[in-house]
């Protein structure tokens, strides 16, 4: 952390600062800032999506710093690099077990053999392939956060083996790992581990099919999850481009099981599943400050406990995005988030909501 603070004065000068350490070692600093304005359109819903049945004063609009990330990437040799990623935006809330996101060492022998150790995101879905600043919606899916809370996605501590085979009719990317299974910045509390695996098939230059699956143990309970995703991207001409992403997942919701004081129902009865589709249309400009305009619409269905008293959540997010630099380095997004639950539960976040979100992003 001290290293980051000492280097902060230099971070505003360039996009990724290269600092030679030795003839073989090079440090690269980069950062990302996301700031939001949230406005609740419902008089009884606050900006966090919590329903209020009484007459208490609540906040219906607020500015916030969603993420303030700083990353150090150290290229130690032609085969070894180390990455540290912190999010200072976590200090706006409870920072316990947060702030530090990536902290790993990667050893790459060739395209076929790569090892990774430390804290990083397991490969278990399409959304694990890119940072949040490249998501073509306001944020990752609700599915991503639910499966992340159950240790299959988001930042976990462990090790993985990955690679890709390119020179065949259908190129294949593969990954398998072993992780503690109790989320980031936390010492393991049992001997159980989870084993996620993933295959991605390049069906064509534009189309990729991903298959994910995993099993393991958490506090002596057997858990599992699996998923499938499809990604299609095509540049129609110099100006127009389209992209379509869809993902389905299902698994054991061990988080819900362990939240109970005295669980009497077997963990296999706590099951979660979800699907989302995200079409995106982009229009590019040349020789102007405005580089791209995009329209995306995410539809998502998620049920965190579908075998018992589940309360299915459907989310609709139309979004307009304007990029003023290449690769979303400067981006302004305006979206409407509409949540619809199978049944409304008063004084909880499981209640129909409508929120306008404006997000401004800068990468450097």
Name every feature range the model reports, one short phrase each.
Residues 18-42, 57-181, 191-193, 200-208, ...:
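Outer membrane beta-barrel
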Residues 319-335:
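C-terminal closing repeat unit and adjoining cap/tail of repeat-based domains
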Residues 48-49, 202-305, 314:
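Detector for outer-membrane/organellar transmembrane beta-barrel domains
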Residues 14-15, 159-163, 199, 228-233, ...:
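Short, well-ordered amphipathic alpha-helices
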Residues 1-17:
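Bacterial Sec-dependent N-terminal signal peptides
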Residues 36-42, 87-93, 124, 179-185, ...:
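Sequence/structural signature of outer-membrane beta-barrel proteins
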Residues 351-364:
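Outer-membrane beta-barrel "beta-signal"
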């Amino acid at each position: 952390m001290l290293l980051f603070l000492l280097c902060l004065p230099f971070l505003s000068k360039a996009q990724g600062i290269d600092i030679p350490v030795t003839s073989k070692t090079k440090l690269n600093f980069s950062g990302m800032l996301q700031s939001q304005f949230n406005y609740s359109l419902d008089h009884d819903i606050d900006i966090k999506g919590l329903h209020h049945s009484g007459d208490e004063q609540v906040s219906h609009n607020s500015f916030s710093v969603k993420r303030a990330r700083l990353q150090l990437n150290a290229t130690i040799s032609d085969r070894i690099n180390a990455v540290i990623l912190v999010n200072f935006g976590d200090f706006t809330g409870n920072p316990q077990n947060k702030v530090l996101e990536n902290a790993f060492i990667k050893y790459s022998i060739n395209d076929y053999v790569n090892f990774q150790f430390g804290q990083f995101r397991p490969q278990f879905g399409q959304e694990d392939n890119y940072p949040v600043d490249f998501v073509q919606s306001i944020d990752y899916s609700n599915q991503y956060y639910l499966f992340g809370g159950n240790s299959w996605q988001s930042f976990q501590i462990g090790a993985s083996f990955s690679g890709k085979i390119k020179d065949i009719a259908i190129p294949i990317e593969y990954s398998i790992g072993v992780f503690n299974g109790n989320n980031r910045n936390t010492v393991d509390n049992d001997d159980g581990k989870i084993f996620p695996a993933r295959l991605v098939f390049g069906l064509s230059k534009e189309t990729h099919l991903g298959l994910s699956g995993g099993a393991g143990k958490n506090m002596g309970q057997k858990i599992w999850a699996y998923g499938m995703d499809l990604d299609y991207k095509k540049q129609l001409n110099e100006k127009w481009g389209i992209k379509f992403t869809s993902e389905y997942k299902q698994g054991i919701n061990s988080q819900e099981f362990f939240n109970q004081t005295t669980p009497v129902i077997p963990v296999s009865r706590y099951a979660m599943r979800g699907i989302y589709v995200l079409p995106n249309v982009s229009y590019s400009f040349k020789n102007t400050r405005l580089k791209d305009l995009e329209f995306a619409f995410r539809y998502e269905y998620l049920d965190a406990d579908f075998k018992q008293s589940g309360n299915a959540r459907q989310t609709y997010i139309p979004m307009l995005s304007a990029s003023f630099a290449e690769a979303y380095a400067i981006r302004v997004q305006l979206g409407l988030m509409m949540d619809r639950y199978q049944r409304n539960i008063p004084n909880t976040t499981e209640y129909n909501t409508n929120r306008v979100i404006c997000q401004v992003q800068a990468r450097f």
